[in-house]
């Protein structure tokens, strides 16, 4: 009688050792949730780390492919001075619109081939961007030289 009550209490506790049975039961491996499952808010900002880069086209002889050289500043491993590091990327140019010397924006995409996983997009020039944004007039006021006398 004492043995049966002891056995039933041990079964209720479900004491098991991985050494005794060869493996741990899957029910004990599942992590308990200490917090309730909350849904994420709808307006979560998308993190886009190193998915876009800017570079200059150095080779455009292949069909629908351009080689783009991206220059970045990185600390030298020994001297800790920031040096220019160059790297060439193969990018997809579906319309063959870019020529050597064009400045393009590389955007990460699905792998297109073994070496191509970026798409080349045109970059709006800085002067055109300022003119488009109305950079000549500060706060909507004309410059002093543009005012009538």
UniProtKB/Swiss-Prot annotation:
InterPro entries cross-referenced by the UniProt entry: NA-bd_OB-fold, Ribosomal_uS17, Ribosomal_uS17_bact/chlr, Ribosomal_uS17_CS
Any single GO BP term: plastid translation
Subcellular location: Plastid, Chloroplast
Phenotype of the disrupted gene, per the record: Reduced plant size and pale green leaves.
Transit peptide range per the UniProt entry: 1-49
Chain's role: One of the primary rRNA binding proteins, it binds specifically to the 5'-end of 16S ribosomal RNA. Required for optimal plastid performance in terms of photosynthesis and growth. Required for the translation of plastid mRNAs. Plays a critical role in biosynthesis of thylakoid membrane proteins encoded by chloroplast genes.
The protein's name in its UniProt record: Small ribosomal subunit protein uS17c
Record gene name: RPS17
